[in-house]
C-alpha cells in the first residue's frame, strides 16, 4: 500500500518521504533549504518518537545505515543532512528510482548492467567511507546526550549540596535569634511551639510570683506568731516580786548601812552581789 502510494517506491523510502514532508515534525525532521535534501534537526527526539511510529525500532544508527544502502549521502559534516538525486520535494514519481544498492547491481543486465555495477561499486566504495563517518557522528551524538544527562545530574547534586549547606546556617541564625528573644525561648521550651507559648510563659511567671508571695506570707505569719508569744511574756506580764523578795527560791540578801552608804542606794536589795568599786 505504501509502495503503491509512492508510485512503486520502496517502503523505507516512502516512509522517510512522509516523515520529511509532514509539516508537524519540521522541528525534528524536514526539508533542507533547496528542497533537495532533508535534515534531522533533533536525532534524539527523532529516534524516540518518529522512528517507532514508522518503523519497528528506535535506533537512529540503523536508520542512517539504511539510508546509506539506498544511496543517500550525508552532505553536511556538521549536521544530519542527507540527499539523493531522486529524493526531491513534491517529486514523488522519482522515488521509485531510489533502490537498494544490492538490488540495483543484481537487477542490471548486459552493457547497461556493467555500467550500473560500476556505479554500484563506486557508490559502495564511497558508501563505506560515508558509513564509517556516520557511525562516528552517531557515536558523537550519543556521547553528547550522555554528557547532557551527566551535566543535569551534576547540577541537581550541586543544588542539593547548596541546600544542605544552607540549612545549618539557617538553624544557627534561628538559634541566635531565639536566645536573644526571651518570649520565643519560653514558647519553644514551655509551649512546644503550638501558639500558646506566650500564655505558658506568662503562666510560668505568674506561678513563680505566686509561689514567692506565698512564701513571704508564710514567713510573715511565722514572724507574727513569734511576736505574739514574745508579747505574752513581756515585762508587764511577769511578776518579779518573788525574784527580789525571796518569796520563791531566792533568799533575801541583807545589805548593811555602810554598804548602803557606799552604794548610795539605801533600802535596795539585790539577788546577787554588785561590785560598785570600779
UniProtKB/Swiss-Prot annotation:
Assembly, per entry: Homotrimer.
Function of the protein: Transcriptional regulator that specifically binds DNA of heat shock promoter elements (HSE).
Region (Hydrophobic repeat HR-A/B): 143-179
Gene Ontology cellular component terms for the protein in this record: nucleus
Organism of derivation: Oryza sativa subsp. japonica
Protein name: Heat stress transcription factor C-2b
Disulfide bonds: none
Motif mapping: Nuclear localization signal: 219-222
Keywords: DNA-binding, Nucleus, Phosphoprotein, Stress response, Transcription, Transcription regulation
Organism lineage string: Eukaryota, Viridiplantae, Streptophyta, Embryophyta, Tracheophyta
